C-alpha cells in the first residue's frame, strides 16, 4: 500500500543517530500507528518494545536479527519482522526509505 487514508501525522520528527535516521509517526482512526522514515547509509542498532514489521520501500541493506548469526540482504520492496523486546542490526548500504508497522 503506497497511500494511507484518514490518518493524523505528528509534525515532530523522530530523530536517531545524530539525524542519520528520521521518521514521522502516522496514526490511524483505530489508534494503530506506523512510522515512515529515511535512513542514511551507515550501521545502526535498534531495540524494540513491540513487534515490528519493517518494510523497506527503497534502498539496499543487510539486517541481523537478535539471536541469529546470518546477515540477510533486504532490498526495496522486501520486508522483515522483529520480535517484541528484541533488537536488530542494520547496515544501510544506500539511503533507505522505510515504513515500520507496530504490531500489538
Describe the function of each predicted region.
Residues 34-35, 45, 62, 89, ...:
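General beta-strand recognition
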Residues 38, 68-88:
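Short acidic-glycine-tyrosine-enriched beta hairpin
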Residues 38, 48, 65-67, 92, ...:
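Residue-level recognition of conserved beta-strand positions in structured domain cores
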Residues 48-63:
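Short, conserved beta-strand element in jelly-roll/cupin
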Residues 83-104:
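Ligand-binding loop in jelly-roll beta-barrel domains
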Amino acid at each position: 500500500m503506497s497511500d494511507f487514508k484518514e490518518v493524523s501525522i505528528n509534525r515532530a520528527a523522530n530523530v536517531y543517530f545524530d539525524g542519520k535516521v528520521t521518521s514521522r509517526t502516522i496514526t490511524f482512526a483505530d489508534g494503530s500507528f506506523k512510522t515512515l522514515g529515511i535512513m542514511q547509509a551507515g550501521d545502526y542498532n535498534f531495540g524494540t518494545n513491540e513487534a515490528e514489521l519493517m518494510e523497506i520501500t527503497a534502498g539496499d541493506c543487510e539486517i541481523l536479527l537478535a539471536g541469529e548469526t546470518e546477515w540477510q540482504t533486504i532490498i526495496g520492496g522486501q520486508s522483515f519482522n522483529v520480535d517484541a523486546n528484541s533488537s536488530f542490526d542494520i547496515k544501510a548500504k544506500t539511503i533507505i526509505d522505510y515504513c515500520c508497522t507496530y504490531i500489538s
